[in-house]
Amino acid sequence: GTSPSGAHTEPWTFVVVQDPYLKHKIREIVEEEEEINYKKRMGDRWVNDLKRLRTNWIKEYLDTAPYLILIFKQVYGQLPNGKKKTHYYNEISVSIACGILLAALQNAGLYTVTSTPLNCGPQLRVLLHRPANEKLLLLLPVGYPKKDATVPALSRKPLEDIMVVM
C-alpha cells in the first residue's frame, strides 16, 4: 500500500478472494440484498436511472471473475493495550487507495467494475472473518472480459464541465 492516508494510519484491508466456494457465497449474499434494493429499497427512479447501464441484481461475474477484491475501511484501529486508535478520515483515505488500485488494475490490462453492495457489509464481514472495526466500502471483481462482453457506450463530461481554472 503506497496510498496517502489521514495521519498515515493506513485504515484499509484489501481482501482478495479466489476460492470458488467463497466467491459463490459472496454472490448469494450480494444478489439477495440487491434484489431487495431493486424491488423495494431504492424506488422506481433509481431503477429507471440504471436501465441504460443494463444492470440488475444478478451478478454472475462474482462467480466467474478470477478474483474478487473486497475493500474494507477500518473505522478505528487497535492499540497494543487494546484501546481504540483513531483513524482520521478513514473513508476518504480508503477511497483514495481504491482510486489508485483502479488505475493500477487498468494499467496492468485488467478489468473491473466498481460495486458498492448496499446492506451486504455485515454478512460479508462475517463470511470473511473480518473484525467489527472493518466496514465494507467497495467490491471489485477483477479479471479479463469475456470475448463477447458488451459495454454500454457511455460518454464522459467534457473537461470544461468538471474543472474550473482560476
What are these regions (language model features)?
Residues 57-60, 126-130, 153:
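A generic local secondary-structure boundary/capping motif
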Residues 135-166:
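C-terminal helix-cap and adjacent tail motif
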Residues 122-137:
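Short, electropositive alpha-helical surface patch
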Residues 1-64, 166:
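N-terminal amphipathic, basic helical "cap/leader" segment at the start of enzyme domains
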Residues 65-67, 108, 136-138:
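Generic beta-strand structural signal
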Residues 75, 79-126:
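Small-aliphatic-rich amphipathic alpha-helix that forms the alpha element of a beta-alpha
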Residues 68-72:
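Active-site-flanking beta-strand signature of metal-NTP-handling nucleotidyl enzymes
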